[in-house]
Amino acid sequence: MSQKKSPRFELRSGNVDALLLALNTADLDAVRDDLLSRFESTPDFFSDDVVALDLRRLEGTGALALDRVIDTLATLKARAIGVVARADQRDWAGGFGLPLLDSQSRRGGKDEAPKEKAGKPEATAASGQTDAEAAGNTGKGKDSEGAAVNGKASEIAEIMAAANAASAPRAIPTLLIDKPLRSGQQIYAQGDVVILDLVSYGAEVIAEGNIHIYAPLRGRALAGVKGNPDARIFCTCLEPELISIAGIYRTAEQTLPADVLGKSAQVRLADEKLILEPLRMK
């Protein structure tokens, strides 16, 4: 095999960001129903995100029809890219057209389940690596051994620096809206969003970060839609059709407390419950 470096491609190790859907039960019909119930009201929650199915919490279940979960994710605009499984699950887990992925804990010699609270049935963000990348890591070790002989240490350092730079977090600017949002209009922000005018009935504001509205909110506001429980909604006149943080929502069918209805207020999440409280200016 030729060792000559090609200018047309570069093979290197790296991380790929993906959501990790950890299954806590083998009742896949219940998982499907919970996913649809949780995310159908926020159709842009996944927005073509890639998702890996994590089976490591399941004990003694035998083979499962994972295609049910895969199809449900597709309905929610998410793309399943692989399966993370323990050694005793891998024979059947790879039979659904998805590759078996190595987790970092497995690469370290342990088939460990994620350390998130087991009772929380939701997708959790994770940084995953594919089998191909694992192979890249193995090859990297071999390249390092040969580097001392071949004088290629600087080339390896260059590749690692480029990989680290590629995975560095990017700053997301705040989205500013200074016009009223009419019924049927939708705004999506990858970070925070600031709105300086009316959000009408039937309008929708969706943000991965916080939502600030310096005007009446009469439509829908969904903050932290990628699962950020620390996101908040701030508003100078709270009269919403729906408010939601990290998928936990409340509709207009539940009358708001008198101290926040039509007044300046903030909405936050505590113990998976929405807290609505007056916005106190100091």
From Swiss-Prot:
Q: Which GO terms describe its biological process?
A: cell morphogenesis; division septum assembly; regulation of cell division; regulation of cell septum assembly
Q: Which Pfam families match?
A: MinC_C (PF03775), MinC_N (PF05209)
Comp. bias intervals (Basic and acidic residues): 104-120
Stored InterPro entries: CAP/MinC_C, MinC, MinC_C_sf, MinC_N, Septum_form_inhib_MinC_C
Q: Which UniProt keywords apply?
A: Cell cycle, Cell division, Septation
- Keyword Protein biosynthesis among record annotations: no
Q: Where is this region: Disordered?
A: 103-147
Q: Listed disulfide bonds for this chain?
A: none
Q: Tell me the domain of life.
A: Bacteria
Its biological purpose is as follows: Cell division inhibitor that blocks the formation of polar Z ring septums. Rapidly oscillates between the poles of the cell to destabilize FtsZ filaments that have formed before they mature into polar Z rings. Prevents FtsZ polymerization.
User: Which family, according to UniProt?
Assistant: Belongs to the MinC family.
The protein's assembly and partners: Interacts with MinD and FtsZ.
Q: What is this protein called?
A: Probable septum site-determining protein MinC
| Organism the protein comes from | Cupriavidus metallidurans (strain ATCC 43123 / DSM 2839 / NBRC 102507 / CH34) (Ralstonia metallidurans)
